[in-house]
Amino acid sequence: MRNYTYSLIKFFQKNWVYFLVFGLVFCYFASFRYLLIPSGDDYFWWGQPGDYLLHHGFVGPVKIYGASINGRYLGNFLEIFTMRHLKLALLIFAGSWTLMSWCMWKLENQTWWALILAVAFVFTLNDSLLNTVLVWNAGFINYVPPMALVLLYLVICKDGENKPLHKYYAILTLIIGLAAGLFLEVIAMAQIVMGLIIVFFFTKRKRGYHFSYLIGALVALVIMMSHPGYRMHIPYRETTFNPFKIWHIYVIANHIWLISLNTILIFLLLLAMTVIISRKRPYSFLDKLFIIVNNVFLIYYLIVGVYLKRVHNDNNYNYLLNPIFAQIDAIISLFLIIYTGYFICHYLSKQRKQVLFYYLCAGLYFGPLLFVASPVSSRSVFMSYVFMYLIMIDCVQTAFTGIKLQNFLFLIILLATLGIAGRYQMYLYENFNANLQRVLEPDYIQGKRLLNKHIPNRKFVWSKDRLDQQNVFYWRARLKK
């Protein structure tokens, strides 16, 4: 016992900085969640409809409950109880984002670059992902906790490649696979394929925890798909295998959310790729060609990023693009995806296998979305964005580690992260106070009219703070506490 305590003290002394960083990250997101303003579906699950579905196995009349009739048992359960219990909401929100940051850091070899970029992840989210995942409880619940669990499994797999793991890890991965598969249909299916890819192609040692994860994932898929809601005709849920319709949806929506809007990620990725090639000596003709192509992509996506800021988009971040531009941009996005894959295979030697796995996973979690005709939502690309971000971290570490400007570049990213983090908290605080003032207006709180004022920073409330998406009964109940 004494030796164990001594080892624990030594471990804390050696890693106290990391404990401090992730402790601050947890506190930041707890404060973040406290200041969030719920919207739309949050009130559906908080109120009588959510209570009815909870007590009827998430089954009910289609005309009333629509797509809420589903097998997302854990996601639905957490949405209901985080809306009813603020302390639980703070714990789940802060814990999930902190776990995701920690997993990214662990997967990227626990370097300082990995630490700052993992912490900065949420501040790189484009407006559509920010609005539908970060600042909306319903979006957060169904996307962030399961992805944090998927990344946790990958951390376990990586640790298992370097050292023997205790047999109890098999129980842990069984629980992870089961839990992660009860949030979203896409994750329930994709994590099984991901687990098989790891077993057959990306591990030297096949262990019990690999197979127990697969068992948990399979059980979760069976439980989810056994739900009667998937055998009902629900107009809101539609699939398509028509190649023209698939391409049309990719052109007008999916590629914009996946590629074009992610200016920060694309910029850092392409900049890192250019530096990686530039550090190679001597240059071949192919190297020079890649540098030119990199710079063309870089300039193009910076221009597109500025252009999209000026294009009108609705409350769901559907952009009203010029049809010709949308077609060209979609084609260029495919070239970028193919180009990135070739770059990984050709220029990344030490970490090629790991980055190639992320590349495949980004496609794996995006692929099923191509066949979804309705609902088409920006938050659906979140899982792929996570793996794209891991690719970027790998490339940035490879590019900037050891160069003369390393400390300067690190300082810039650190200051930018702290600045954006502070600004987000300021926006949320302004919104929180403005919302309190408007919901306390006598005519609203007495149910005589809807809200008639927007909060200052509308993108920090789901659907850009649509006034008809607030619920007077919720605010009456919350303000009484």
Summary of predicted features, one role per range:
Residues K14-F29, A114-F121, I171-I175, S212-L221, ...:
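Alpha-helical transmembrane segments
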Residues V150-Y169, R205:
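Membrane-interface transmembrane helices that cradle and orient dolichyl/undecaprenyl
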Residues N3-A67, Y73-M100, E108-W113, H210, ...:
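Intrinsically disordered, polar/acidic, low-complexity terminal segments
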Residues M100-I116, L125, N137, T398:
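Transmembrane alpha-helical segments of multipass membrane enzymes and assembly factors
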Residues A120-K158, N322-T340, Y365-M392:
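Membrane-interface micro-motifs in multi-pass membrane enzymes
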Residues F32-R84, N137, E185-V193, F200-T340, ...:
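Transmembrane catalytic cores of multi-pass membrane glycosyltransferases
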Residues I116-T124, L214-L218, F285-K309, S349-L370:
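Transmembrane alpha-helix segments characteristic
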Residues K288-V296, C345-G363, T398-R423:
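Signature aromatic-anchored transmembrane alpha helix within multi-pass, membrane-resident enzymes
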